[in-house]
Structures are given as C-alpha cells and as structure tokens.
Amino acid sequence: MAGPTEEIIDDLDMISKLSKPIKELNWLERSLLFAELAKLSYYSDSQVTKVFQAAGIGEIQFIEHDGAQAYILGTDDDCMIICRGTEPGEWNDVKADANAFTVMTEVGRLHSGFNAEVDDLWPLLEQSVEENQRPMWFAGHSLGGAMATICAGRCKMSNIPSNPSAIFTFGSPRVGNKRYINFVRVPHYRWVNNNDVVTRVPPTWLGYRHSGQEIYLDSDGELSRLTSWRRFSDRMRGVGGALLRWEIDYFADHSMVQYIHHIQNALDQHRCGKSDYRLSHPLLPEVTAT
C-alpha cells in the first residue's frame, strides 16, 4: 500500500481553499479537499505548514508514535484528522500492511495490523481533541484510509463531544468483518480508482468487507456505477491502456496524483454544467449547488 513521498506530488500547492464550513461544500468539493490533504499528509509539518495556512487552515498539529502518523488540522468551523498512508521505508507500516489476521474487538473483528497502528496513535489523538466540539472529519490514502475509518469508529465510542461527520478515503483496503462494518455508521465516501489493487485486499474469503459508499472511477477516470461484468471489462480496458503507457495499472491507479486529477475533472465538469448521467446517477451521492 505504497505512498512514497516523491510519488505523491511535485508541487505543494492546494487547489482547495477553506473560507467556509466544510458542511457547506458539496461532496465533490469535500472529496477534492480531503484528497489534497491526504496527499500532503506524506510530508513533514515543516514542508506543508505554509501550504495548509494558505488554504485557510490555521491549526496544524502533527502526531506520531512508533511509525503511526497523522495530522490534526483545524479551522474556526471544523476539525480534520488526516492519517498518513504506507511509507515503504517505515518497517512499522510494512508490518501493519502484511499482518492480515483479524483481532476481536467489542464491535467486531478488525485487521490486526491496521488496528495496531491506531492503537499507537489513539491516545495522542484522543488527548488532542477530547474537548473539541466542532464537526470532525476523517480522511486518508491507502493505510491512512484504513486508519481513518478505524479512528472514526473509535471517536463514536469515546467521550469526545463531537461525533464524526464523514470519512473520505482514497485507495483504502478493507478493514474489518461485516459486524464491524455495520457498526461504523458514519457517512463514508470511499473512492476507488479503476484497478487500484489496494482496494481489493485483504480478501473477502478471510471475512473482510468494505464500508461506506463506493465511488468508482472507470478506466477513463470518470465517475461510474457499473455491474460486475461491466466493471471487469472496464478493468481489463484499464490494464490494456496502462501497458501501452508502459505502466502497471494495478499500482499506477493507487497514486494520489491520479485520484486528485480525476476528482478535479469531475468537479470542473459539474461547475461548467457538463455533468453527464454518471455524475448525476441516483446511486452516487447528490451534487448540490453552493
């Protein structure tokens, strides 16, 4: 579940700017915001503090314990928890990804590696937001998406006065069994880019399930709602196109650069009134004017 820094972005600017509460953004604008924050979470606070501030984020706290890392970001209106994804050079991250056994919790079975990462981080996170009363938003890419999902679940059970508003994940693996997924009743926008291989692990035959509303980007990078057969055909088309570009689609599609590019295109189409049936499909979240 790779997210090496040099692969994430060459330019540290943000398109999104926070000048109003996040709840007043439509779901595509929120998705772009959290995709950019998930991408920037791979950088040190010294590298991204000015970027966050320029985007309207005044509160910036980086927390880390035993290789598990996250940013706690805040404005006057919102609190955001952005979990960092896998860094191949971090043994703790690699170990977390590889450990696919489940561990029993009071609300269901969880991936033991992902749960251990949150165990490392949770005391610091809970202490930092224990008096927060602003809406809380959770996001992450790859391993960070799994951690964000688990953190949101723990937030629901904690004494933190503010409940999670939503989770936004990009290329996230499955995190737990059906019982756990049914427990995490938090709006979850789960982005999947065509052949992103990380979204297919751990396997369902081990009891793992995905949570939330899947938002699928097809081989053309457009929002789609496809049947199983059409999705298989679309994925094969994606593999073929990648081979022509001398790329391995399963890994190329996991890049946050691609996620951000496709979400930005979808948002631009909406703003220009060029949304097609895929964008307004009733099974996808509604896009409302702002």
Segments (PLM) and residue ranges:
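Non-catalytic, mobile gating and regulatory segments of ester bond hydrolases
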Residues: 1-139, 143-290
